[in-house]
Amino acid sequence: MIVVVDTNIIFSSLLSHKSNMAEILLGKIHQFVAPHFLFTEIFKHKEKILKFTRLTEDELLELLSLLLGNIQFISTSGISSSSLQKAFDLCRHIDLKDLPFVALSIEYDAMLWTGDNKLKTSLTQHNFTKFFNP
């Protein structure tokens, strides 16, 4: 099964790296994918992550390397305009930063793994129900 990993799943795994989420990410059971945009989001919030995790920068980079090692990163340029448009229609009232994740899920007919309940609720109201709930 292909699973699109949202940024907040990575954040949660970093904040509690012994969590069930981190274990699932480190496992080889599912094929995880994410847009390159995930990197931007992580490094945009790097200082906040360091503060909350109390990790050193080297420890954070090592943990990120482990967590991201099982994720295949995909450029949004490889997503069809049809999938991007559907994702835009679904995300425009929530947060356009979610668009690349939703578009990947549509493009690959994949499950979306997110902890963003506002996003889940809105997508469900628009008949998107392909959520990964481990």
Regions found by a protein language model. Name each.
Residues 10, 39, 119-120:
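A generic structural signal for short hydrophobic patches within well-formed alpha-helices
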Residues 17, 45, 125-126:
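Residue-level signal for well-ordered alpha-helical positions
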Residues 21-23, 61-64, 101-102, 120:
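Short amphipathic alpha-helical segments and helix-helix/interface helices
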Residues 1-34:
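Short, well-structured N-terminal submotif of metal-dependent ribonuclease cores
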Residues 26-29, 33-88:
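PIN-domain endoribonuclease scaffold, especially VapC-family toxins
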